[in-house]
Amino acid sequence: MGDIAKIHITPETPARPTILNPFESPNDYHRLHESVVPSPSVFKSCKSSSATPAKFKWSIDEMANLLPVEIDPEDIHRQAVFFSQARADSEIEEKRQHAIEQFFTKGAIVPSPWGPLTSKQSMKLPHHKSPLSPLVTEEIQPPKKINAICQTVLSLPVDFNLEKVLGDYYKTEELTEQVQESLSSSSLRRKLFLDGHDSGSESSTPSSPDRNSPSVHPSSRELMSSAIVSPLQCGIPTGTPMSGQFSSSPIQGQCRAYSLGSVTSPMFSERSSPAFKSPILSPIRLQQSVTPESGERKRLSFLSPNCVPKGSSDINMNRSGESPLVEGCSPIRSCSPFQSRPRNRACMWASPAHISPILHPVLHDKENIHITQHLPTMDLDATSTDPHAQQDSLHAESSESEASVAVSEQMEQDELFVKDTGENVETNGKECESDNEDEGENELGEEESCAWVPEEDTASPVRLSSTGTGSVPNAESTHMFLSLLAEGSITPYDTSMQVDSGYNTHSVCTTSLMDTLSSDSQSKEMLDTHTSEESGPFTRHTKPKLFVPPH
C-alpha cells in the first residue's frame, strides 16, 4: 500500500499571471470594444513549455507574510472614501464610453428581431434540411409579421386623429384640380386639332385610288394646294396621272423623272380645303388646267426644272407602240424647262419623245406634212410601228438635201443663242420659220395649228414649234443647253447629232455638252451613221449618233 504514489494537486504557481477584471484597471479601455465571449480554447488543458524558467516573483500574500507592513486603519478608510467620491479622469472616462458605444452598435451579439432585414437569402437545398442552421431551408417561406412595441420620442394615444392635426398641411384636392385642369386643356387642344383636320384636309392619311374621287365638284380642283419646288415650274399645267395614288417612283405616267421632286410628300392630301392651303413660295401662282373628260381629281405634281409634266389629257395618244423614255447622255431630262400652255388638240409634253414627228401619233389625218426643219438634240427610243411614222420617214428622205443646207445656218444661230438667250430667241425662231415658207401654204397652216402660241408676256421665251411638221426653233437647243448646266462644263462647240429612228435619217445641229468624247469615237460613230443612211426604212431601236460635220 505504501508503494502507491499519492496524487498531489500542486497549487498555482506564482509565475502564472493572474486574471484580473478589466473594468478594475483604468488602462484596459482599449480592449473594451472586443467581444466578451471567450474562445473555445480557453477550456482546453494545455501544457506550457517551461524550457526557460520564468522570473520568480512573490505573490502579494507571500510578501505580506514575509514582509508584513503595518497599515493604519485610518489610511484604509481615507482611501476608501477617496475612491468612492473621486471619479476617474475625464479623458479616460470619455474613451471608456466611446469603447462601450462601439461595442453595442457595431459588434452586436444578438440582432434585434424587428431590425432591418439581412442581405443574406436563404439557400435552397432540396436533398436535406439541416436543423442546426436556420438559414438553410428547403423552401422560401413568406416573411412573418412581428408585432413589437417600442418607446419613441413622440408618444401618440390610441384614438389619435392624425388627419385632424395634419389635414391643413396635406391637401390632395389641389393636386387633383391641377391634373384635371391640365387634362382639360390638353383634351381641348386635341379636340381642336382633330376638328381642324376632319373639317378640312385629311393630310394625316394618304389618299387611296378607290375613294370617291368622281364625287368631288370640278371647281374644287382649282383649289388644290401644292408646293412649288422651283420658280421655273410656275405656269406648268399639272396633268391627270393614270394612277390614282401618289408614287415615289422616278417613272411617273410613262415619264422618267431624274429629279429630286419626283418623291411626293404624303402631307399634301387630295381633299385639302382652301382654308388649309400651303403658302405659295413663288409670286407667280401655279396654273392648273381642268380636264372635264377625266373622272379622277387632280394630283399634285412635285417637279424640278428638268422634269416637265404631261399636259391636257384630251389628246388621243397611242401608247401601246411607243416608248417615251429618254435614254441619253445625261440623267437629267433634255426637255425645255420653260412653261407650257394648255390648248385643245395640241402637242403634249409628256416626254421629249413626243416632240419628234416620228413618235407623235396625234396627227393621224395629216398625211401631207413634210419635215423641213431639224429637231432639237435628244435621244429617242423608237419602237413604234405606226404607219404614219413610216410615211413621215419617206418624206424625211426627200428633205435631206434641205437639211444639209440648213446645218451651217443653224450652227451660226446656236452661237448667238449661247451668247444671248433673251432677245435672239424670237429672231432665230422667225428665221427658222422663214426657211420653211417655200414648202407651201398648206404646210404653214398645219404648223400654226400645232405651234406653241406665245403670250403677251415678253419675259416668257418662244415655245417649241410644231411636232407634226418637225419645225423647231433653235431656241429649244439653247433651252436644253441651259437645262443641262448641272452636268458641269458649259463650253460649247459645234457638233452634229445624228438621230436614227429607223424610219428616216436627218441631222440636227445643236450645242452639245459631251466634252469627254474623243475623236476616235466620233469617227467610228460617223461611219455607223453613213451605213444607217444607206439602209432602207425599217423598224429598229434608236441609237444616238454624234459626229463632226464636214466643212
Swiss-Prot record:
A cellular-component GO term for this protein: nucleus
Key words, A-Z: Cell cycle, Cell division, Mitosis
Pfam families referenced in this protein's UniProt entry, alphabetically: BORA_N
Region described as Disordered: 194-221, 379-474, 517-551
Any one GO biological process: cell division
Biased composition (Basic and acidic residues): 416-433, 522-533
Annotated Polar residues bias: 382-393, 463-474
Gene Ontology molecular function: protein kinase binding
Zinc in keyword set: no
Listed Low complexity bias regions: 201-215
Biased composition (Acidic residues): 434-458
Family recorded in the similarity comment: Belongs to the BORA family.
Function: Required for the activation of aurka at the onset of mitosis.
Protein name (record): Protein aurora borealis
Organism, scientific name: Danio rerio (Zebrafish)
Gene: bora
